[in-house]
Amino acid sequence: MGVAALISWFVTAFVGLYLVAVWLIENDVTHRGAAASRLPAPVILGHVLLALSGLAVWVIHLLSHSSMLGWSALGMLVAIGALGLTMFTRWIPVHIAYVAAESGKHGRRVADYDFPAERAFPLPVVVGHGLLASTTVTLVVLAMIGVGGG
């Protein structure tokens, strides 16, 4: 179960890094001509750094069989999830508004620069990242309580 959690964590991290890349490419740090991001940089940075640090702790746990490190990795996942849910709830209104503007329901199409960088996040990627993260947490919990032989 521990190795399955590791694989799930790696895949989740790669999908998350794709989202960070999209955000960095689309983000106008000068705030000239584009709406400011609704995702605070410290929250994004904290989420990414905690996720990568937690992944490292989980790898060390698997190699050393240290229960303390396993539970620490799970605690880190809780913090990672809290930051992820914070970003998700701040992204939803941007996505809804951008989809409505793209459809032209209000008689005119709104330019991309009227929306923050996270408008470019593909919905399937965001949903997939969240589902993978939930799977990772579940697998880590199962591994830590001894289901699946380690």
Residue ranges with predicted function:
Residues 1-150:
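Membrane-embedded alpha-helical bundles that constitute the cytochrome b-like, heme-associated redox core
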